[in-house]
Each structure stands twice: as C-alpha cells, then as structure tokens.
Amino acid sequence: MSASDLTSVQAGAPQGRRQILVTSALPYANGQIHIGHLVEYIQTDIWVRTMRMHGHEIYYIGADDTHGTPVMLRAEQEGVSPKQLIERVWREHKRDFDSFGVSFDNFYTTDSDENRVLSETIYLALKEAGFIAEREIEQAYDPVRQMFLPDRFIKGECPKCHAKDQYGDSCEVCGTTYQPTDLIHPYSVVSGAAPVRKTSTHYFFRLSDPRCEAFLREWVSGLAQPEATNKMREWLGEAGEAKLADWDISRDAPYFGFEIPGAPGKYFYVWLDAPVGYYASFKNLCERRGLDFDAWIRKDSTTEQYHFIGKDILYFHTLFWPAMLEFSGHRTPTNVFAHGFLTVDGAKMSKSRGTFITAQSYIDTGLNPEWLRYYFAAKLNATMEDIDLNLEDFQARVNSDLVGKYVNIASRAAGFLLKRFDGRVQASAMNHPLLATLRGAIPQIAAHYEAREYGRALRQTMELADAVNGYVDSAKPWELAKDPANAVALHETCSVSLEAFRLLSLALKPVLPRVAQGVEAFLGIAPLTWADAGMPLSPEQPVRAYQHLMTRVDPKQIDALLAANRGSLQGTAAAAEAGAANGNGAGSKNGKGAKAAAQPAASAANADDGASPIISIDDFAKIDLRIAKIVACQAVEGSDKLLQLTLDVGEERTRNVFSGIKSAYRPEQLVGKLTVMVANLAPRKMKFGLSEGMVLAASAADEKAEPGLYILEPHSGAKPGMRVK
C-alpha cells in the first residue's frame, strides 16, 4: 500500500484484512522510561489495539537502542560492561512497558545478531549502488581519554552569539547549528581537556545524490501530516538548491556498536543501526512465529509500515531512513506519524519540581496506569502539537469521566439485575433507542482512533456516557425497586444500562484494555471487537457479581508522586546534612542573618533588619540553590522594575526568570555573569510570561537610606548547575 492510499483506508470501515507493521521510536539504553516517553508508546499502543479489534494482522515492534558512546561511558562509570548495562536496562524498560499496557509483539535489542547482519546487508547494498563515500575529516579528539568526541560531548563558546558552555552541534541560546570544530575555547565533557584536532577516515551516505533528492520529493507527498510535509520541503529546498548534505554513518574506536565491514576500527553510527533495529526485532519475531520476513520488507511488498515518533527525530525518519531503504532494495514506510512534546503543569519536566516523573515511580506510588493512558489519549490528536499534563486537571478528568460517568453506570445497575432478575438482561430492552444511538456511534469512534484523533473519540464517548447517565437519572431505578409492580420497568432500565455500559467499554477498550478485561469477565462475554457493537447481551448469559473497576485519584497520591521524583532536592538535603556534620553547614558562619533577599517576579519583599527566625537544617535543605549563568537579558516592555533573564542552570534547557533589578543593572551588564538562583520555587504566571525561579540579590534593610541592589556572584570556577550548600 502506498502512502497516498492512507486517507482512503482510514475513511471508513476496514477494507479486508490488512497486514501492518508498526513501530515506536527505540528508547535509549542508558536511562529510565519517563512519562514523556510514555506519550508515544501509549499513542502507538492505542492505535495498534484499534487495528487488532478490526481483525487485521498487525505486529507492534520495539527494541532498546543500545549502541553509542553514551552507553559505553555510562557502563564505565557503573563499573560494568556495556552488555551488562544494556541487559539490565532492557529488563527495566520491559517492566515499565508491561506496567502501562504497552502491548509489543516483540521488544528486542539493537545489539543482536539479526541487527548486525541486516545493518551490514543494507550498508553493502548502498555501497554497491554508489551511495557510500569515503572521506578524510577533521574532528575533536580528547588527548586524555584518547578518543574522538561526539558532538554532544564537546562544549564551548558559540561561534555566532558567543554564549558559553554550548554543545558541539548547536547553540541553545541563539539556535545556530555548526560543526564541533567551530566552537571557541572547546573542552571535553568527558575529561575537561581541551580537544585537539585530528583527521580520520569516515564513511558517508550520499544523501546529496540527485537520486535521493528525486526520490524524497516524491515520497514526501504521501505523508499524512501537513507539518511533516512542510518541514521536509524546507529541508529539501527548491529544485536545484541541493540543500541535502551527506550523512556521516561512521564512528571511530573506542565505540560500542557494530564494526563496519572491511573497515577495521570503524563502527556504524548509532543512527544507522537503530532504525534497522525495527527490522531486526521483526525478523526475530518472524523466526519464532514462522512468518515470512522477506515478504514484509521487500520492495514490492503490499504490507503497510508505520512509524510513530517524536517530532524531534523527524529528520532521521523522513530523510535518511526512507532513502536508505529505497536504495538498498527494501520497501519504504507507508507513513510516519510524529507527536509533540509533553509539558507538566505548563512547563518542561523538571527534577527540582518533581515533574520529571519516571514510569516506575508512577507505579510505585500506586497510581493506576490506565488513568494516564486515558488522560494522554484525551489530549492527543493527529498533529504534532505539544500536550500538557496538568495534574489538577488529570485528577478532575479521571474522577469525573472514568469514575463519575463511566464505571458508575455499571455500579448503579448491576446490583438490581443480580438481586431481582438472576443477573439476566431483558431481551426486548436490547432494542431501546438509546442503544441504537450508541451502536451507531461505534464505527465513527473507531474511525477517530484509526485517524489518531483520540481526543475526538473520547469526547464523543463521554457525550454518550452523559446520555446514558441522563437516562438512568430519569428512570430512577432506585425508586422503581421500591415497588414490585415496577419490575418490568426496573428490568428494562437495568438491562439498557448494562448494554450501554458494554458499548461504552467497547469504545474505551483501546485506551483502557485492563478495565475492558474486567468488564468482559463481569459480563461473561468474549473479548470485545468492533464487530461486536451489534451483538447485544443475551438473557442466556447472566452477568457476574460486580467488582469495582476503577477508584478515584487521591490528591495525596499526586503529592507522593511529586515527592518521589524530587531527586535533586534529596541530593541537596544530603549535601546540606553532610556540610553541617563537618562544621560547614547553614548555621556555622553566616548565622547573623545577613540579608540576601531573593528577588521575586515583581519586586523584593521588605525585610526586617534584625536576625531572621532560626530554622533547622531540614528547612534549609528544602531550598535548591543553584549556580546560574545569565545567557541573555532584556528589559520587560511595560515594566519599570523588571528584567527578563534567560538562565543556564545546567539542565537540558534554559529557564526564564523575571527579576526586579532593572533599577540597578542594564541588560548588557548581566549577560555572561554567573549568579545564584532558587531552582525549586514553584513557577509563577505573570502577565509578561512564566517566571521559573528567583535570582538572589542583596540590599540594605532601609533602601532609601542605603540605596543599592547587588546580585550575588560566585567566584570564578563555579559552573551552571552547581548546588550552593
């Protein structure tokens, strides 16, 4: 099936039994699964379950992405071999995916014999077709560790805006991309040594070949997402621009990965063998199940192949990967579906705020994984828009939709049916007009899921749940039960309610698979499929005793979850206690209450010039003070007090802070300075934007008598992200 056929396939009911291969991006094998990762795996799993319910032959394939310098160095830090590290991480990742109901048909590893053979086969086919070039390149080399340094293992001064401590491939301040050799005053993140320049032979995939450009211009027209199509056209440029650059697919030893055939000491770059890992995992499954692997991947295959990814890796999946497949003689993806990023409470995930939430901590805290599946699904659509996990809304939506609207229907009807009617529904009730409405909506809900419009599917489902609850409220079965003369009406009401509950459970099954299993057991029915919409409950099959299917979210669980993920705060507390034990704690030398007033978003609070109240070491340990570098600063339009600071706090992103220090500093005076900030202060929304912390400044108690405002500056040698303790 070609990419352009997708719309016609998704428009209505399934057109015959389709053969579909589906993947999610491979998680890297040097860290934990967090809720940002789970957005993609839950999104993919819902789609896969939808297609399984249509009866299609569909395989959901995954693997750990195991190769590269970061894994090699992480293993070294832990005192284990890379293979030992990736085996342990694989078990952790598999546990997390199982906990959240991510139903891989095979979850494998890229460090496999299948992947080695397939990577070599594809490489040699590309080489035979003239798509591999060999060149001498100059790279940064760590003379201490005697290794070439990947781009992200070099930092230095941006060659364009001169911001300090920028990575070797791009500047997080001005957005410029460049080569590591372009950095000013570079240093190795591994050893701290100044890299030297050294030449080495590398191997390139010739993406600039006119054949690649011609193929990609045609292939991009089939992408389902306009945002992806537009981005690809931007990368391709106009015809004749030749914007595509060749891609370096090799790395030098020492490196954890696959050695390139015929090139001793040279290894495939991880981004070559990682996507091949999709096929390797599927090949492993095919060998175990007796499937014809070649029939699925050969160029003339009529199967479908879909990749679900984050928008940050669109470049690899829509340029390199399809071109590699096309010119090595394999089928190309039917489509690539990209999603946006996850924020928590309107901000990027943060360890200091406890919102960098790992999958395991969510489970350990006792939260139901299907709560998160439902919430993410309610926010997801077919675009690359970012989604936000608002924890208050999460609690309210789960409690209202899933408990108040959905499972409440069964709890209101099951008891009466079991007690009064032996658990058997009334046959004539199955023809009620309300049920006809629900059955008529099921195909549209299924189509929404298939089109990845999960939010629409759930909105429609909850509207139907409202209608069912309205029916129950109007019929008042609790009142009918008081008079034996109302037995027929009571039987009808309970029967309609439970059949409606079955249909709502069918609509929710891709999102809530474990709840659906409980419903199937309760009703005594076979696993639900989309075809079952028109097969109502039968009086021949009594329902069983109702068991609670879902509980409400307790606010204390959310508090516990955030507390469990404040890893940086725990580290600060431990450091503070250690300092106190050595006579260097908070109360040792500065116990006179010297005033270092934190400057909040609007203005500094007035303070007494006497000593502040005595606090315990535990109180002090709650404050996460960090060294911050001011990488940008500007006046705030409409304010005579505020400056807007962009701070590097040693995280993966910069922070935005508004500070009332405009009277003391011009913006250009502050850029490049180090200061101290409160890193775990709750973000504050202002009319100018979101302030994500406070910088510290000193002033006299009587500012009129002693004017002056002075931000705190650490001695040279301090670096962004260091804790103040």
Swiss-Prot record:
Domain tRNA-binding: 619-725
GO cellular component, one term: cytosol
Gene Ontology terms, MF aspect: ATP binding; metal ion binding; methionine-tRNA ligase activity; tRNA binding
Highest taxon, organism lineage: Bacteria
Locus of motif 'KMSKS' region: 348-352
Ligand binding (ATP): 351
Catalysis: reaction(s): tRNA(Met) + L-methionine + ATP = L-methionyl-tRNA(Met) + AMP + diphosphate
Record has Metal-binding as a keyword: yes
Cofactor binding note: Binds 1 zinc ion per subunit.
Cofactor(s), names only, from the UniProt record: Zn(2+)
Main location per the UniProt record: cytoplasm
Pfam families, per the entry: tRNA-synt_1g, tRNA_bind
Record EC number: 6.1.1.10
Intervals of motif 'HIGH' region: 27-37
Positions of disulphide bridges: none
Keyword Transferase appears in the UniProt entry: no
Protein location: Cytoplasm
UniProt keyword annotations, A-Z: Aminoacyl-tRNA synthetase, ATP-binding, Cytoplasm, Ligase, Metal-binding, Nucleotide-binding, Protein biosynthesis, RNA-binding, tRNA-binding, Zinc
Family matches, as InterPro entries: aa-tRNA-synth_I_CS, Anticodon_Met, Met-tRNA-synth_bsu_C, Met-tRNA_ligase_1, Met-tRNA_synth, Methionyl/Leucyl_tRNA_Synth, MetRS_core, MetRS_Zn
A GO BP entry: methionyl-tRNA aminoacylation
Subunit text: Homodimer.
Record's function text: Is required not only for elongation of protein synthesis but also for the initiation of all mRNA translation through initiator tRNA(fMet) aminoacylation.
Assigned protein family: Belongs to the class-I aminoacyl-tRNA synthetase family. MetG type 1 subfamily.
UniProt name for this protein: Methionine--tRNA ligase
Higher taxonomy: Bacteria, Pseudomonadati, Pseudomonadota, Betaproteobacteria, Burkholderiales
